[in-house]
Curated annotation (Swiss-Prot):
UniProt name for this protein: Pyridinium-3,5-bisthiocarboxylic acid mononucleotide nickel insertion protein
Short name of any one Pfam family annotated for the protein: Ni_insertion
EC number: 4.99.1.12
InterPro entries, sorted: Ni_insertion
Amino acid sequence: MRALVYDCSAGISGDMNLAALIDLGADRENLERELSKLHVHGEWKLECRPAQQHGIRGTRIDVLTEEEGHSGSSHAHHHRTMADIRKLIETSALSNTVKRTALSIFTLLAEAEARVHGTTSEEVHFHEVGAVDSIIDIAGAAICLEMLRVDTVFTGPVELGSGTVTCQHGTMPVPAPATALLAKHFRATLNGTTHEATTPTGAAYIAALAQPVPSPLAGRITATGYGIGHRQGLPVPNILRVMLVETEEEETSPELLTELCANIDDMTPEQTAYLAEKLMEAGALDTWQESVCMKKGRLAVKVCALCQPEQTDRVREAFFRHSSTPGIRQHGMLRHILRRESAPVHTPHGTVHVKTSFMHGRPHYRKAEFEDCRILAEKTGLPLGQCQLMGLFPTSSHDNDATDSV
């Protein structure tokens, strides 16, 4: 399993996180190519350069925009709503995985800002998430996670800082109000620095994606990235360290999860499909529907969602908000997962990623990535099944049935 391990002892911000992921090995040219799919209004440029603090070499980034002429402030004053951000991401040509990751971060940030300002998450006008540089920071991080083939994200305690910070609403205490709300999702420390160590964007990223580092975490550190911040002359280095760890796994990896479910007989299929989307955006790992017959003989659906324990509150709230059910059943369960790897396979018509699961240290089951095969089929006009076979057997004639899964 490929895990990112965050050392946030000096805090985390959106620009430091993206810089650390680039320093870790995410391809910058490919990142900019993917980011261009967002069609953000106005010109922007990702400036990436080597930097040092306290003798440690790393990467520093700036997002140069047409509107601002520079970046570096995490409290930019460009107004957008969550509805604008959602439309920007959902209508882009980014992969579904990247869209889900980015939206999960933005959604958490929007919920925190909405609570601070006393409005709804879709209607809130908030400045940090609306700035072009923050859109690039969050969407860029989601793209980098996919490029680096990250399976899971871990973090140690996150330093929030102390003092005050100046934004459009005036001088605010550190942590900023939204950061303080987001900090309920992870273990935090205070007063380790005399500045704003963690921004709302950085807090939302950790809250949406990271789990506490297990003890012990066995594996090989295959790469380390350092994101260098813009603050100078601090007693504590303004640096974010991220390590890529190839973990040593058991044959199956047990994982404690929460299942939430409800029987619903008064929602349309369109409404339950929309509910499933909202559950995934709220942090569910999976959601599904089962046909059931209720006590008065009425046909209904049992809507279920599976999530990490720390995401339970958010998923349960989305369940109530977007469904007609007055009650939700909840219980814990263990999920056992075989070790899995994903690798690109080059075919005569393009690249297809193939997932392989392992038992007893040997390949057990292979499956061609559907989205890659779908894109290949649309580009070439070949049948989808043939494109799936090309991913599994790139040098075969693809005329015969295969034993691997397509």
